[in-house]
Amino acid sequence: MKNTYNLRSIAAKAISQVLDQGQSLSAVLPELQKNISDKDRALLQELCFGTLRVLPQLEWCIQQLMARPMTGKQRVFHYLIMVGLYQLIYTRIPPHAALAETVEGATVLKRPQLKGLINGVLRQFQRQQVELLERAVNNDSHYLHPSWLLARIKQAYPAQWQQILDANNQRPPMWLRVNRLHHSRSEYLELLTQADINAEPHPIYRDAVRLITPCAVNHLPGFELGWVTVQDASAQGCVDLLDPQNGEQILDLCAAPGGKTTHILEAAPKAHVLAVDIDEQRLSRVKENLQRLQLQAVVRVGDGRAPDTWCGDQQFDRILLDAPCSATGVIRRHPDIKWLRRDRDISELAQLQSEIIEAIWPKLKHGGVLVYATCSILPEENQQQIAAFLQRHPEAQLTETGTTAAPGKQNLPHPEDGDGFFYAKIIKK
C-alpha cells in the first residue's frame, strides 16, 4: 500500500520550524512523525539532521542556482529544495526518486505551481554538481558552522579547531551504558557478540560500549529489560567521576532526561537520589527512564538558582550539576544547535551557570563532592567558570581534574570516542 504522506515535505516543515521558529528538532519531530512507519521515520530523521548538518553548503549551492531566495510564505519551499539537494549529494536514494518525491512535496504543501521551479533547480544542480561542489570547498560554507562559532572555536583551540569541526560534521557514534546491576561489561559484550553486533569497550569509562555499526534499540539484548541504556561515553564520565556510594544523599541537578540519574543508581542502588530539573515536561523522561530500569529516585521540578524552594535545608554528600550550556560539544548529535544558538547566548549562559553553582554550593556538606559538568567546549562556560568559582571560594578544592591554573578536564568530540564534555570535581573542605 502506497504511503499517504510525503517525507520531503514533512522534512521541509521540520526544518522551517527549526530555522524560522527557533524550535529544536527533538521538540519538532515527535509530532511530525506520529503516523509514519519505522523505516520512513529513520529516513525522515536522516533528511532533517543531514540537511541541518550541511546547511551552509546547501545554502551556497542554492545561491548559485537561483537569482532570488524564496522568502515569506514560500520559505518552506527553499527548505524543500535543500532537502532535494541533500539527497542528491549525500544519500543513495536514486536521483529520479529523490527528484520525483521532492517535486511532489510542492503539491502536498499546496503550491503545485512551484513544481516546475523546484524540478528545474534540482535538474540544473545535477548538471553542474561536480563543478559546484568543487567551488564550494573554497569558501567558508565548507566549514558548515556559523561564522561566530567558527571564530570562537578557532580562538579557543588554535591547533585543534579543524579536527573539532570535522568531528562535529560527522554522524555520531552509538555508545551504550551497560547496567552493572544485571551484567558486567564483558558479559554484555559477549551477549552482543552472540547477537552478531560488533562492539568494543571504552578504555576509561567502565560501563561504556561503542557499537561499530549503530542499530535500533530493539535489536539490543535486554534493552526492554533494562540491561543497557543508550548514552554517550563522555556523559557516562560524569558519574564515574562523582563516584556515588550507597547510603549517601545525592543531588542530580538539571537532571532531565535522566541518563545520569539512572547511572548514579546503577552505581549505588542504595543511594538516596533527588533528581531536579526546571522543565516539568522533560522530567517525565526521567520518570520513564527510572521505570524502564526499575530504579527509584525522588523527582522534583525546581530552579537551580533557588534550591530552598525544593529541598529546604537538606544537604547532600554529592552533587552532580550538569549545567545548562551552549551544547557546543554535542553538535554532531544535534546539528540544529549550530543554527539555534547565537553569539550573545554564551555570556548569558555563563551568568546562569555562575548563579546556579553559587546557589547550590551551600547545599553541599563539608567533605562533600560537587561535579560540575557541561556538554560545551567553550572556555567561558568551563575552565573560566570554574577558575572564577575557585577564586571566590577558598574552601573549594579541585581534585582529579586539572590544576587551579588550568581547572577541569575538557573532552573534545572524536569520531571514535565521546562527545565534547567538560568536568570539574570539587571537594568542600
Swiss-Prot record:
This is Ribosomal RNA small subunit methyltransferase B. Pfam families: Methyltr_RsmB-F, NusB, RsmF-B_ferredox. S-adenosyl-L-methionine binds at C254, A255, A256, P257, G258, G259, K260, D277, D303, D322. GO terms for cellular component: cytosol. It catalyses: cytidine(967) in 16S rRNA + S-adenosyl-L-methionine = 5-methylcytidine(967) in 16S rRNA + S-adenosyl-L-homocysteine + H(+). GO terms for molecular function: RNA binding; rRNA (cytosine-C5-)-methyltransferase activity. The keyword Phosphoprotein does not apply. It comes from the Bacteria. Belongs to the class I-like SAM-binding methyltransferase superfamily. RsmB/NOP family. PANTHER family: NOL1_NOP2_SUN FAMILY PROTEIN _ ANTITERMINATION NUSB DOMAIN-CONTAINING PROTEIN, NOP2 YEAST -RELATED NOL1/NOP2/FMU SUN DOMAIN-CONTAINING. HAMAP family: 16SrRNA_methyltr_B. Its main location: cytoplasm. The keyword Endoplasmic reticulum does not apply. It is found in: Cytoplasm. GO terms for biological process: regulation of DNA-templated transcription; rRNA base methylation. Gene3D superfamilies: Helix hairpin bin (1.10.287.730), NusB-like (1.10.940.10), Sun protein, domain 3 (3.30.70.1170), Vaccinia Virus protein VP39 (3.40.50.150). Its EC number is 2.1.1.176. Specifically methylates the cytosine at position 967 (m5C967) of 16S rRNA. Keywords: Cytoplasm, Methyltransferase, RNA-binding, rRNA processing, S-adenosyl-L-methionine, Transferase. The active site is at C375 (nucleophile). The lineage of its organism: Bacteria, Pseudomonadati, Pseudomonadota, Gammaproteobacteria, Enterobacterales. It comes from Yersinia pestis.
